[in-house]
């Protein structure tokens, strides 16, 4: 099983210098929810990912980790 994080929210937040508290305020979410997302304990819904991308001014693809094997499987 692959133990790589499923999302890159923490990375993008660090690049934008946005804290969990700040992102939570932007999205109207509890900081505990943001913490679960950035630690990959749980994953945001697609709707939440879209909101996160808007708040962080990035593409939704910047927030999602896909390795080459996943991409190749999806091309079949």
Task: Label each region the model flagged.
Residues 28-44:
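Recognition helix of helix-turn-helix/homeodomain-like DNA-binding domains
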Residues 7-26:
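Short basic helix-loop element that most often maps to the first helix and adjoining turn
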Residues 15, 41-44, 55:
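Helix-turn-helix/winged-helix DNA-binding modules
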Residues 9, 23-24, 34-37, 63:
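Conserved hydrophobic/aromatic packing and binding residues within compact polymer-binding modules
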Residues 1, 11, 16-17, 64-76:
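Short, charged recognition helix plus adjacent turn
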Residues 47-62:
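DNA major-groove recognition helix of helix-turn-helix/homeodomain DNA-binding modules
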């Amino acid at each position: 099983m692959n133990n790589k994080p499923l999302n890159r929210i923490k990375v993008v937040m660090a690049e934008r210098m946005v804290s969990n508290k700040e992102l939570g305020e932007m999205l109207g979410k509890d900081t505990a929810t943001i913490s679960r997302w950035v630690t990959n304990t749980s994953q945001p819904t697609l709707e939440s990912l879209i909101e996160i991308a808007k708040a962080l001014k990035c593409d939704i693809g910047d927030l999602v980790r896909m390795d080459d094997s996943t991409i190749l499987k999806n091309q079949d």
